[in-house]
Amino acid sequence: VLNNETTSSTYYHIAQTLLNNYSIIDKSSISDIATLCTVSKSTISKFARSIGFEDYYELKKSSTFAENKYHFDLNYISNIINPIEKNGYDDYLDAIIKDISAFKQQSNMRSIDELAKCLTTYNKVGAFGLLFSESAAIDFQYKLAYAGKFIITYQSDLKQIEFIEQADEETLLIIFSNSGGFLQRQQLRDDIPYRNVFENTKAKIFVITANEEVRNYRFVHDVILFPHETIFQTHSFIYQIIMDIIVSKYRQYLEPPTISHKQ
């Protein structure tokens, strides 16, 4: 909301107030929150629905902080920050180098080549992910823009779902998901209900992931797979390398524009 709403909007004000008082949301009634935000209870309810919850109660239930909020076994603080604080950063840097080397040795350029070729033929392209994978999708948008290719990405979970649901056969979807969970679970709500939006879309789907099982998903056209050789989650670095190779291949396969000399 803070990235998409104007700073003068009511929803921006509500979002900022809730974030500044995040620790009390799970203990507060809708009346308490409405008073805190100086808006009506109905406005709070509308705000909750606008960000993907059925009502304020569901928002409240999902607000309890937990590092494993998205049900991943390896998380940023426990997997990266705590070991750095305990043992220094040498092991972490060594892990990044090892995983990059493993990708260099094991990477399959066929899938990267195919995605690059698809980027030259598909005009409607969306790239999505969650957390650090979402950051990768945004980076990919910028990197492709430097090559003259403009794609769509959204941080809003609802806008992502809307784009995927409305995608047709002329749409290319690129999904960044280290674990592959983004394809199977709706991770906004606390009970992570099953996500079937990808099963119903008509788009061609490429997935960039470390999970080999994604190859077996019937709705996935192709997978760009990268290995993990260490205990650290280094996918945010591997993503950057994969994206740079894709952009390079895209430029290679892009036919130069022809100039008509007809009068």
Model segments located where?
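N-terminal intrinsically disordered/low-complexity leader segments
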Residues: 1-5
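HTH-adjacent hinge/linker in prokaryotic transcriptional regulators
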Residues: 6-10, 20-27, 35-38, 43-111
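Basic helix-turn-helix/winged-helix DNA-binding cores
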Residues: 14-18
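Short, mixed-charge aromatic SLiMs
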Residues: 70, 165, 262-263
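Glycine-rich phosphate/diphosphate-binding loops that line cofactor/substrate pockets in enzymes
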Residues: 111-122
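Glycine-rich phosphate-binding loops that contact phosphosugars or nucleotide phosphates
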Residues: 120-242, 247-255
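Internal, active-site/partner-interface "lid" segment
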Residues: 254-263
